[in-house]
Amino acid sequence: MSQYWSAVVHGLTPYVPGEQPKLANLVKLNTNEHPYGPSPRALAAIRAEASDALRLYPDPHADRLKAAIATRFGVEPREVFVGNGSDEVLAHAFMALLKHERPLRFPDISYSFYPVYCGLYGIAFETVPLDDDFAIRPDDYLPHGSVAAGGIIFPNPNAPTGRLMPLSDIERIVAGNPQCVVVIDEAYVDFGGESAIPLVRHHPNLLVVQTLSKSRSLAGLRVGFAVGNPDLIEALDRVKDSFNSYPLDRLAIAGGVAAIEDEEHFQRTRMAVIATRERLSADLASLGFDVLPSAANFVFTRHPHRDAGELAAQLRRRAIIVRHFRQPRIEQFLRITVGTDEQCAALVEALRDILR
């Protein structure tokens, strides 16, 4: 710690991202990256943009990208906000829409960046326990008596559990909380869920956030977006323009547009991930693992007779990395990214050997 740090920095507990080790022949199944490459059209667009034009600032509004997203999801460009990955979009949403006198509510087991944002921006919050099956209970997010939330946020599918909430339950939560903004974090929705974006037209308090990092294979490019009522988008723009007027560079805009427009590549690769996930879930179950139903590009699993931390360590010794969370209620679970068929087969074979 430094004497020059502000009081806010002294009190922060920063988010810890999944590690990115540089090891040869590594089977990397710890950070939910797409096992297949980006759209060839996106790569071509990025290469074409890598020209003398890089001496010029990018479009501060990223209008081409907003238009592509709007067309893809059947909304208006003025209902779209874009940012440097969905983490930045979420950060702006916390500051612009979720900081109020009443506390923000989100699940106790969820994306661990949420409490970090609250600490950074001084947002009061309360966590709501998942049920015994690690599902979000919609009734827990409805006002009870005079107690109403200052905001609500949760991923759908949830992370790290992979559990999916039906769209009907999401709409019930949004409709039941007209006093606040409800943010649905849909980083993994393309792997088995139904997006809440169509509900935006009917609910001015709903903001839906997505990313191109997962289903569009562009984690290294950092492109995220939100869809919501123009009033919510204006609030996000105000925060963005008070922080960084040029969050997306020329390469990100060009690659993002092409990735959004390449529907064939998107559908083919996401369906491949879904098929592999189902095989992996069945293979893990055959080894005695308890596997939660997943609508994401990962599985959340535990073995009833083996310590999760020790399993992760033994896999690592075999050059296979998975994610282990040292957190109450889930310390005996592993989150395993769905890789290629070959990577998942190597994982299953390693676990079979460990369990002998």
UniProtKB/Swiss-Prot annotation:
Keywords: Amino-acid biosynthesis, Aminotransferase, Histidine biosynthesis, Pyridoxal phosphate, Transferase. The keyword Transferase applies. Its EC number is 2.6.1.9. GO terms for biological process: L-histidine biosynthetic process. It catalyses: L-histidinol phosphate + 2-oxoglutarate = 3-(imidazol-4-yl)-2-oxopropyl phosphate + L-glutamate. The keyword Metal-binding does not apply. It is an enzyme of class 2 (transferase). Homodimer. Belongs to the class-II pyridoxal-phosphate-dependent aminotransferase family. Histidinol-phosphate aminotransferase subfamily. This is Histidinol-phosphate aminotransferase. It comes from Aromatoleum aromaticum (strain DSM 19018 / LMG 30748 / EbN1).
